[in-house]
From Swiss-Prot:
Localization: Nucleus
Induction of the gene: Circadian regulation under long day (LD) conditions. Expression peaks at dawn, gradually declines until dusk, and increased at night.
GO cellular component: nucleus
Phenotypic consequence of gene deletion: Late flowering under long day (LD) conditions, but early heading under short day (SD) conditions. Enhanced sensitivity to salinity, osmotic, and drought stresses.
Gene Ontology molecular-function annotations: DNA binding
Cited SMART domains: SANT
Superkingdom per UniProt: Eukaryota
Subunit structure: Forms homodimers.
Domain HTH myb-type: 19-73
Protein name according to UniProt: Protein CCA1
Sequence intervals crossing the membrane: none
Ranges of Polar residues composition bias in the record: 122-135, 387-406, 542-553, 573-582
Gene3D superfamilies cross-referenced by the UniProt entry: Homeodomain-like
Length: 719
């Protein structure tokens, strides 16, 4: 061992040098012959070979054997014979490098034959399995490829709404004017079947795109929640579309038949639900093409030639020829479920047959919160029941069809859950959680308030709004569009103290706001969402640390009050259509993926959250200059209860004339709701301890008449 200068031994051990003391002993012919005999007798048993040779050690014999075997292999390669054939010996297999499971596999011939047979059989079975699996995978891939191909073929854009995993999604697409003449009627039926003939589906649907085939295609797709079976039966004739749709769809008790309008290869093949079922509207395309009508109890819809996906929905069939893009005249503000949803029998069933877990969660939330429960009951009273009358779009008196759906018994829990889902979807749509496609001209619908609010006083709204005749409906809608829809929804601020804690609630809803929660009540306007009644005292949308509404908030039923979060200063300052379109584009970017949308914080929510902790004014606290006077009034009367009368039927063009006469009172809540004192409780979760602790210390006690929907921070109220 080497020693360092410090006297310590070296850490690295160096190998000892060695010298070859004796010369390499050559193998004589006799030793080699004995070696060959021992190989035939003992194979690789080196000790026995050593005993047999007698003059060589085991190490020398192994070295000699290695050289000899390599020499034999070279000779065999050169001569083309098997190794060892010249000496009639079988070269024993080499020593294994690692310890195998079976160390000397001497039965190589038998094992090789059986293994090859097993491999062939396995290959056959594996090939069958892979053929089946690849057929299924190819079927799924063919569906996806077909959908993507249809999206990208004509350059049309599609934003897909996915509330739940693999449930039918509503598609809002722009349609090119060069789409071919093709209408398809499709329905959804909950049967659990396997994927079948998907390649045939792709081939036939592509040929259907040319408008030549009228084949019946069964593309059956396993859906995870409740197995939705899609039977698409397209027909390329426009005139018989309603007839064929009513023939193809047979009414079933538990069927989920959602209308599906297919423009060949120009639209994404997703599910499109039309929302004109409750009031019996007729949808007319902006190019004056065939109206998109709903069939009674069939859920069929006729996809028409060159039809715009954002149709104007006039009040009367006389207005079908109108080609101007008008705001959506919604009769009952309680339903803005999605952008285009059939509120008829089939859409009701599709809502009711969603996930049982989601429904039970909604039921528990409704039962634990009386205010939301009361509002949902009112909304459900106007929602079509399962066995009730379904409005007929061909009726001349559309008010009868509008009243027919809610002229029955009090709503059950299923209808309440369904109406709550619709209201929540409407609120999500207006708030930007759900992607909406920006319209090419203006907003094609009024994102109307989604439910009545908790109130304690009954007052009539303006008589001119109630008694608007049917003849002036179109004129009024065009006027509102010319004035940039500033007059679409009027908010009349009257400071009246709350004298009675009970009362009936009319559709012209008055919502009472206490000083503790003076938030922006901003109804969504017709073509713009820029009309804002702004108050100084704001409630932060994310004051609890989360952008999602807690279960105690009446936000699913309070869309105009929740709309202000999505509006920043620039949007409210500008009243042009481009600003509204840009805002919708921003909503799409902020909520592009909706699979985990309840976990995401949108762009506006992040701005509001930053402004809260920097103690600045929140985005919803900015208001147009024409409302500054009302802000000062509301600040002076801080100790009083402010009554805001929201006219929900300004643009609804008053479908039910019988309810809207000047002599008769408005339709009101059910009797059991009129005596119910609506009070909301805080049952939501508290994600951040800091916010909740601070809010507990600074919370203002509220009276019985006023529900504290949000926690207000005093330092924020002073801004």
């Amino acid at each position: 061992m080497e020693i360092n200068s410090s006297g310590e031994e070296a850490v690295v051990k160096v190998r000892k040098p060695y010298t070859i003391t004796k010369q390499r002993e050559r193998w004589t012919e006799a030793e080699h012959n004995r070696f060959l005999e021992a190989l035939k007798l003992y194979g690789r048993a080196w000790q026995r070979i050593e005993e047999h040779v007698g003059t060589k050690t085991a190490v020398q014999i192994r070295s000699h054997a290695q050289k000899f075997f390599t020499k034999l292999e070279k000779e065999a390669i050169n001569n083309g014979t098997s190794p060892g054939q010249a000496h009639d010996i079988d070269i024993p297999p080499p020593r294994p490098k690692r310890k195998p499971n079976s160390p000397y596999p001497r039965k190589s011939c038998l094992s090789s034959e059986t293994s090859t047979r097993e491999v062939q059989n396995d290959k056959a079975t594996i090939s069958n399995m892979t053929n089946n699996s690849t057929a299924q995978m190819a079927g799924d891939a063919a569906l996806e490829k077909l959908q993507r191909k249809e999206i990208s073929e004509k350059g049309s854009c599609s934003e897909v709404l996915n509330l739940f995993r693999e449930v039918p999604s509503a598609s809002f697409s722009s349609v090119n004017k060069s789409s071919s003449n093709h209408g398809a009627s499709r329905g959804l039926e909950p049967t659990k079947t396997e994927v079948k003939d998907v390649v045939i589906l792709e081939r036939d649907s592509i040929s259907n795109g040319a408008g030549k085939d009228a084949k019946d295609i069964n593309d059956q797709e396993m859906e995870r929640l409740n197995g939705i079976h899609i039977s698409s039966k397209p027909d390329h004739s426009h005139e018989n579309c309603l007839d064929t749709s009513s023939q193809q769809f047979k009414p079933k008790s538990n069927s989920v038949e959602t209308t599906y309008v297919d423009w060949s290869a120009a639209k994404a093949s997703h599910y499109q639900m039309d929302r004109n079922g409750v009031t019996g509207f007729q949808a007319t395309g902006t190019e004056g093409s065939h109206p998109d009508q709903t069939s009674d109890q069939m859920g069929g819809a006729s996809g028409t030639m060159n039809q715009c996906i954002h149709p104007t929905l006039p009040v009367d069939p006389k207005f079908d020829g109108n080609a101007a893009a008008q705001p959506f005249p919604h009769n009952y503000a309680a339903f803005a479920p999605m952008m285009q949803c059939h509120c008829n029998q089939d859409a009701y069933r599709s809502f009711a047959n969603m996930s049982s877990t989601f429904s039970s969660m909604l039921v528990s939330t409704l039962l634990s919160n009386p205010a939301i429960h009361a509002a949902a009951r009112l909304a459900a009273s106007y929602w079509p029941t399962v066995d009730g009358n379904t409005p007929d779009p061909n009726q001349e008196n559309l008010s009868e069809s509008a009243q027919g759906s809610h002229a029955g018994s009090p709503p059950n829990m299923a209808s309440i859950v369904t109406a709550t889902v619709a209201a929540a979807s409407a609120w999500w749509a207006t708030q930007g959680l759900l992607p909406l496609f920006p319209p090419p001209i203006a907003f094609p619908f009024v994102p109307a308030p989604s439910a009545p609010f908790s109130t304690a006083d009954v007052q009539r709204a303006q008589e001119k709004d109630i008694d608007c005749p049917m003849d002036n409906a179109q004129k009024e809608l065009q006027e509102t569009r010319k004035q940039d829809n500033f007059e679409a929804m009027k908010v009349i601020v009257s400071s009246e103290t709350d004298e009675s804690g009970k009362g009936e609630v009319s559709l012209h809803t008055e919502l009472k706001i206490s000083p503790a929660d003076k938030a922006d009540t901003k109804p969504a306007a017709g073509a713009e969402t820029s009309d804002v009644f702004g108050n100084k005292k704001k409630q932060d949308r994310s004051s609890c640390g989360s952008n999602t509404p807690s279960s105690s908030d009446i936000e699913a039923d309070n869309a105009p009050e929740n709309q202000e979060k999505a509006n920043d200063k620039a949007k409210q300052a500008s009243c042009s259509n481009s600003s509204a379109g840009d805002n919708n584009h921003r909503r799409f970017r902020s909520s592009a993926s909706t699979s985990d949308s309840w976990k995401e914080v949108s762009e506006e929510g992040r701005l509001a959250f930053d402004a809260l902790f920097s103690r600045e004014r929140l985005p919803q606290s900015f208001s147009p200059p024409q409302v500054e006077g009302s802000k000062e009034i509301s600040k002076e009367e801080e100790d009083e209860v402010t009554t805001v009368t929201v006219d929900l039927n300004k643009n609804a063009a008053i479908i039910d004339q019988e309810l809207d006469t000047a002599d008769e009172p408005r339709a009101s809540f059910p009797n059991e709701l009129s005596n119910l004192k609506l009070k909301s409780r805080r049952t939501g979760f508290k994600p951040y301890k800091r916010c909740s602790v601070e809010a507990k210390e600074n919370r203002v006690p509220a009276s019985d008449e006023v529900g504290t929907k949000r926690i207000r921070l005093e330092s924020e109220a002073s801004t």
